[in-house]
Amino acid sequence: MTATAPVITVDGPSGAGKGTLCKALAESLGWRLLDSGAIYRVLALAALHHQVDITSEEALVPLAAHLDVRFIAQDGKLQVILEGEDVSNEIRTETVGNTASQAAAFPRVREALLRRQRAFREAPGLIADGRDMGTVVFPDAPVKIFLDASSEERAHRRMLQLQEKGFNVNFERLLAEIKERDDRDRNRPIAPLVPASDALVLDSTSMSIDEVIQRALTYAHEVLALPQQ
């Protein structure tokens, strides 16, 4: 059952709309959801909760291998559940972010989390949100989507998000940060940010989120022959 459960992977750069699309797909299809971008933060928080030495690869590996985490999409929002507790806000703190960066530096921790991510593949299906879901984590996924947008559009979206939260932000600075991250992600030696050869590439620059969701759903139904709802 686990090996044959279908997977829809959604990869792409930050700000392209992956999270919104994946939540909508998971809710529409009633499938499980994996937010790979949050998983290192969840591991970091678990390490802090259990007072595990974050500088010890030996100590982190078993925690990563048995990480008790679920991602729930509901009403367009993502809930991150660690050991039965909603930690959606807690994983976004600076302390957790710094700890996550340390944990991600260990090869054996990365390998343990790779196996843990693959274990999310269960019936009726999985929506996998990330940067290397279709190329590394689920290379055999029947539906692969690469969601992109211009760096200017992504910076604009990020600026609006931050302004809604009351932050005063500089567009040019945001744009420079996004371009720098893009360059780093696309040129890294391990798992660079590139579309899988068999991925549907969607450029959301001039598309509404509803258009993106409908295009992705139509494609998934075509490939998987899913029953129309």
UniProtKB/Swiss-Prot annotation:
<dbReference type="GO" id="GO:0015949">
    <property type="term" value="P:nucleobase-containing small molecule interconversion"/>
</dbReference>
<dbReference type="InterPro" id="IPR003136">
    <property type="entry name" value="Cytidylate_kin"/>
</dbReference>
<keyword id="KW-0808">Transferase</keyword>
<comment type="similarity">
    <text>Belongs to the cytidylate kinase family. Type 1 subfamily.</text>
</comment>
<dbReference type="Pfam" id="PF02224">
    <property type="entry name" value="Cytidylate_kin"/>
</dbReference>
<protein>
    <recommendedName>
        <fullName>Cytidylate kinase</fullName>
        <ecNumber>2.7.4.25</ecNumber>
    </recommendedName>
</protein>
<dbReference type="GO" id="GO:0036430">
    <property type="term" value="F:CMP kinase activity"/>
</dbReference>
<dbReference type="GO" id="GO:0005829">
    <property type="term" value="C:cytosol"/>
</dbReference>
<dbReference type="InterPro" id="IPR027417">
    <property type="entry name" value="P-loop_NTPase"/>
</dbReference>
<keyword id="KW-0547">Nucleotide-binding</keyword>
<feature type="binding site">
    <location>
        <begin position="12"/>
        <end position="20"/>
    </location>
    <ligand>
        <name>ATP</name>
    </ligand>
</feature>
<dbReference type="GO" id="GO:0036431">
    <property type="term" value="F:dCMP kinase activity"/>
</dbReference>
<dbReference type="GO" id="GO:0006220">
    <property type="term" value="P:pyrimidine nucleotide metabolic process"/>
</dbReference>
<dbReference type="InterPro" id="IPR011994">
    <property type="entry name" value="Cytidylate_kinase_dom"/>
</dbReference>
<keyword id="KW-0067">ATP-binding</keyword>
<dbReference type="GO" id="GO:0005524">
    <property type="term" value="F:ATP binding"/>
</dbReference>
<keyword id="KW-0963">Cytoplasm</keyword>
<keyword id="KW-0418">Kinase</keyword>
